[in-house]
Amino acid sequence: RGSSVFVLSERGATSSQARLLAQRENEADLVGGVNLGAKDLFLARTLLDLSQTATINDSLKLGKYLLGELGSINTLHKNNVEQASFAVLKAPDIPSALIETAFISNPDEERRLNDDAYQEKLAIAIVRGVRQYFSKHPPSPKNRLAALA
């Protein structure tokens, strides 16, 4: 019951729920590889690892803002950002988060998710969380085009 926010983990899932959800999501999606265009495989892997670590830290910050906003309109499943190895969260240069807004297996939450006003509250909470993150952590010059999108 409640909302959850997940970000990528380098060390595995923070809970059994996170691990199971990541396995299910990863089996459902095919993910293309990252082409760094480097001839030195070791260098390419090192650069990717460094970038991924920085992105995970940024994603954790983003997740905290999202949880703060979601917690103002919904019960939180957990008060902290969870981590798991979701294939869809592996972009090495863009903070990303997977948001579970509720559990449709819970009749009360399913009813709320079908309510237009509640959907709007969820959307506004997510937008606020993203805006808070970017207002405090603006993109570096190399990523300014992403901020315009």
Which residues does each PLM region occupy?
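Active-site-proximal helix/loop segments of hydrolytic enzymes
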Residues: 1-149
